[in-house]
């Protein structure tokens, strides 16, 4: 009669042990409230990746952005960007559509530069008209003609919305939600449980690489918005 409680206790302790180690490469486990974590995986051919859900008008996203880019380049891991425009930032959905236009119609490299420049120029953009003026000037400076209608079919907006819906499935509640992922594990850097320090990305990334059986041996794809 006394063995059953002992067995049950052992099962509970084992479960707690699993919870304590899941989703951490360094430090103690943080409760993240994520739901569908199936998207927290590196792309084919990579063992480790950086995943970020970001809003172009988010000040902390602007702070995290150069750290993410530098870490991805230094450690040869993919940087997977998902657009998560917040409702209170009335221009950022359109900004994400502009970035998608550049990615599809011009070049992914120029789209990456546009995102970087928007982040660094947030103080100049308060509304959709400001974004329009910024984008027109930016395109002229980069030898591009701004189209009269950026997204006539609505396909680019649909892809931004698809990113946002993925964030809802994951239960993204803040930006940036920044996560280091491997094939069977992940750790949140920013976006959950008051984690707001993007400088923790590098130590977490290094720990994740160390824990994989084969770290990436050559440069991965350049940072890109998720298709």
Q: How would you describe each model-predicted region?
A:
Residues 1-8:
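Bacterial N-terminal signal peptides that target proteins for export
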Residues 18-23:
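Sec/Tat signal peptide C-region and signal peptidase I cleavage site
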